[in-house]
């Protein structure tokens, strides 16, 4: 299918960018073009190694996920209520994603649409940071059904490859009253069910593209993606205590025209 080196590079890119507001899909498309790894099988490989990044979040927030199954006294984001909040957040993008899956795969997975998504997302990040909404939600236990559903609606923006699911949900959370760090942490946790569902759905449709000979490459991509995502999430949460999202917006603005110029 590809070299182990290519699989490792894609795993690093996936893990480092999946939960940052810079678009993992966009970076994977760009990296794939640079490495000469493109096409339907390449796109499915990139989706498959997302499982490594998903697992990293499950490990980092294991106590929260455990609390969803076995509620802890005094925690509001746990048990049936916590699962209900995640359901509300996952619902809008899940429905729209199922309806538009084939269109997105056929028409939006290319450097040009990604470049525009990077630019539009950057401008929106700067607008949200300038707005400086006064937070009303300071912990995960203060997330309300209204906030969860609102974040879910913003998550639909991430169906445009290059926009970034993390950017969409963190911006949405901030606009709707969540503190920046809490918006990010909720974004990470809420990503798990929808990313797992999207990855599973894609693999059900494309598993015939892979053979046993591809397993080493998938394994390398998965493991490297897990390790990179673990480091990226830890670092990002630390930085959010000191920085805004503006540096990520400037990075996106710098990258977008370069992508358009390079592939025009």
From Swiss-Prot:
Q: What is this protein called?
A: Undecaprenyl-diphosphatase
Q: Name one GO molecular function term.
A: undecaprenyl-diphosphatase activity
Q: According to its UniProt record, which protein family does this protein belong to?
A: Belongs to the UppP family.
* Reaction equation(s) it catalyzes: di-trans,octa-cis-undecaprenyl diphosphate + H2O = di-trans,octa-cis-undecaprenyl phosphate + phosphate + H(+)
Its Enzyme Commission number(s) read 3.6.1.27
Report the InterPro entries cross-referenced here: UppP
Tell me which GO cellular component terms the UniProt record holds. Answer: plasma membrane
Q: Which residues cross the membrane?
A: 15-37, 42-62, 84-104, 108-128, 143-163, 182-202, 217-237, 243-263
């Amino acid at each position: 299918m590809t070299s182990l080196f290519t699989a490792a590079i894609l795993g690093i890119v996936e893990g480092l960018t999946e939960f940052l507001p810079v678009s993992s899909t966009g970076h994977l498309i760009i990296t794939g073009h640079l490495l000469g790894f493109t096409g339907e099988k390449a796109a499915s490989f990139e989706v498959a190694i997302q499982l490594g990044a998903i697992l990293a979040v499950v490990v980092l927030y294991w106590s929260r996920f455990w609390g969803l199954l076995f509620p802890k006294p005094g925690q509001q984001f746990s048990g049936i209520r916590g699962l209900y909040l995640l359901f509300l957040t996952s619902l809008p993008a899940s429905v729209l994603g199922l309806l538009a899956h084939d269109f997105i795969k056929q028409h939006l997975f290319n450097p040009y649409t990604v470049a525009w998504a990077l630019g539009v997302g950057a401008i929106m990040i700067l607008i949200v940071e300038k707005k400086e909404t006064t937070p009303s939600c300071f912990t995960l236990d203060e997330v309300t059904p209204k906030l969860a559903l609102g974040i879910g609606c913003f998550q639909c923006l991430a169906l445009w490859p290059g926009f970034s699911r993390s950017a969409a949900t963190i911006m949405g959370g901030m606009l709707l009253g969540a503190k920046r760090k809490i918006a990010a942490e909720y974004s990470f946790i809420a990503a798990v069910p929808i990313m797992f569902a999207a990855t599973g759905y894609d693999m059900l449709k494309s598993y015939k593209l892979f053979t046993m000979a591809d397993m080493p490459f998938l394994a390398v991509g998965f493991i490297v993606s897990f390790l990179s995502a673990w480091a990226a999430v830890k670092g990002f949460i630390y930085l959010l205590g000191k920085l805004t999202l503006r540096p990520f917006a400037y990075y996106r603005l710098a990258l977008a025209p370069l992508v358009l110029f390079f592939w025009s």
